[in-house]
């Protein structure tokens, strides 16, 4: 059976083992390094279903825990799968889960060790199904006992390591998985073929799937997961990113290129903050659907200057509720606002504004 690991996207600590069917409680404290007082010491309860490849997430704290953009809700339980992100509280402190096949049988041994140390714990009450669409809870007569990360998980993991039961594959995963979420992006940042510009603070790369004739990403070398992770102390960095974006636009080799925009997606597709610098022709085979189009032509695309202003005045970035609904808006030309029923028709129309 696979082992399940909870991994801090921001790399704040080592991966945390989530034993099969054991309830693990996380929140503010040394295990997560979270110091935010809006995060309860018992903010979430996680229970891995290693044989099914998902983790049940129960919100215990008062402030919202969410999976991607979906709020779990206090007392409710939702499923989290690999590829999704768990935000412990208020869309902050992102985590992913990873399942790795256990070649040594260590899952069984670690589960038995945990059960033995906690066999006197009270049984949890049966869980109630949440009203949310993705929520699915399997109720059994006897729920697994809760365990503290500090004592049982760390003790169990230490026992596995000392007894030599941890497989080589999982051992390698432990060494490298803290940054697994952005390995592809990190590789692109370091790839001379992808780099267009770099300095000691940022690097500019070509977007792997450009949505226009010119589409670059400005990324800080510093690991920052998303807009919501930005704080006032990042203001100078974000200003520098915008300055580099303006430099890229000035140096564009195509003098006939239409105007550019530079900005951020409200909910980014990659877990490393990045500034899009994109020409407004949208002439690219990679622009294929309504989601692509609306992510750059509606308020889902937040102007770089607006982000700078929010940091200067508020010290943080606020994302409007229901931002994802903007991706479902009708297709409209961003120049004349004419509505279209499909992407091919819209692209054909764009030729009248931006001849090749």
From Swiss-Prot:
Domain HIT, first and last residues per copy: 182-287
Residue span, FHA-like domain: 23-72
EC numbers for this chain: 3.6.1.71, 3.6.1.72
Pfam families: DcpS_C, FHA_2, zf-C2HE
Feature type site, description Interaction with DNA substrate: 188, 265, 276, 291
GO terms for cellular component: nucleolus; nucleoplasm
Renumbered zinc finger spans (C2H2-type): 331-353
Compositional bias segments (type: Polar residues): 132-141
Residue ranges of the region described as Interaction with DNA substrate: 207-211, 269-270
Alphabetical UniProt keywords: DNA damage, DNA repair, DNA-binding, Hydrolase, Metal-binding, Nucleus, Zinc, Zinc-finger
Comp. bias (Basic and acidic residues): 104-127
Region (Disordered): 104-143
Alphabetical list of SMART domains matching this protein: ZnF_C2H2
Catalytic activity: a 5'-end adenosine-5'-diphospho-5'-2'-deoxyribonucleoside-DNA + H2O = a 5'-end 5'-phospho-2'-deoxyribonucleoside-DNA + AMP + 2 H(+); a 5'-end adenosine-5'-diphospho-5'-ribonucleoside-2'-deoxyribonucleotide-DNA + H2O = a 5'-end 5'-phospho-ribonucleoside-2'-deoxyribonucleotide-DNA + AMP + 2 H(+); a 3'-end 2'-deoxyribonucleotide-3'-diphospho-5'-guanosine-DNA + H2O = a 3'-end 2'-deoxyribonucleotide 3'-phosphate-DNA + GMP + 2 H(+)
Motif (Histidine triad motif): 272-276
Residues at the catalytic site: 274 (tele-amp-histidine intermediate)
Domain characteristics, as noted in the entry: The histidine triad, also called HIT motif, forms part of the binding loop for the alpha-phosphate of purine mononucleotide.
Biological role stated in the UniProt entry: DNA-binding protein involved in single-strand DNA break repair, double-strand DNA break repair and base excision repair. Resolves abortive DNA ligation intermediates formed either at base excision sites, or when DNA ligases attempt to repair non-ligatable breaks induced by reactive oxygen species. Catalyzes the release of adenylate groups covalently linked to 5'-phosphate termini, resulting in the production of 5'-phosphate termini that can be efficiently rejoined.
Name this polypeptide is given: Aprataxin
Organism: Takifugu rubripes (Japanese pufferfish)
Lineage summary: Eukaryota, Metazoa, Chordata, Craniata, Vertebrata
